């Protein structure tokens, strides 16, 4: 293998998920504010679904073909299993968000056994946080070891294809929303110049008007 894979996009995306989880946790303590952050929650789900679905279809299979050791194969099985754990946790947040006071359970208002919004978000944050850490600590080094920059480019190209222009118009300013200065610099430096210009002139102002977290952040 020749060349080093640049994981900038992976890290900045993971960190954007973490920031959104922090925003959701902060809002969970105020049931009256749930409607205000619903747009941010829907975007979080959209971004996470895209990220995980392309990993499942185009990254893990490619990695499976490249590895030979049993420990590496177990790691890939763990990655897929961790993805599968996330969907029911997202559904639990949806259910709890419909009744943030906690009186509605997963089967309806007569079922008081469902988690409160704060509890559902805490479970999601724990599971997703552990998965992101696991991926960064073990899967990314394995990818660096056995895949090529061309392999990674193919994965990134599929991500962009599924995202489309409309998706990119939200993804780019979402990544920048609340990112530290150094992370913003690295992310913008990895983008083509026309994309950074589009973001500055069109996408960023439009993103702020969407008010994902109640107001421009």
Regions found by a protein language model. Name each.
Residues 1-217:
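Small-residue-biased structural context
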């Amino acid at each position: 293998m020749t060349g080093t894979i640049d994981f900038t996009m992976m890290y900045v995306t993971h960190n954007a998920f973490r920031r959104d989880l922090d925003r959701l946790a902060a809002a969970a303590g105020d049931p009256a504010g749930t409607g205000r952050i619903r747009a941010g929650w829907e975007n979080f789900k959209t971004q996470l679904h895209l990220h995980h679905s392309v990993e499942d279809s185009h990254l893990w299979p490619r990695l499976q073909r490249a590895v030979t050791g049993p420990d590496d194969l177990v790691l890939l099985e763990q990655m897929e299993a961790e993805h599968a754990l996330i969907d029911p946790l997202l559904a639990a947040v949806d259910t709890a968000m419909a009744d943030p006071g906690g009186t509605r359970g997963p089967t309806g208002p007569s079922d008081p056994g469902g988690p409160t919004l704060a509890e559902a978000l805490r479970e999601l944050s724990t599971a997703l946080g552990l998965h992101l850490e696991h991926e960064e600590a073990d899967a990314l080094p394995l990818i660096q070891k056995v895949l090529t920059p061309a392999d990674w480019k193919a994965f990134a190209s599929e991500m962009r294809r599924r995202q489309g222009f409309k998706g990119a118009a939200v993804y780019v300013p979402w990544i920048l929303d609340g990112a530290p200065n150094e992370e913003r610099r690295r992310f913008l430096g990895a983008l083509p110049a026309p994309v950074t210009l589009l973001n500055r002139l069109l996408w960023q102002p439009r993103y702020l008007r969407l008010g994902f977290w109640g107001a421009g952040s």
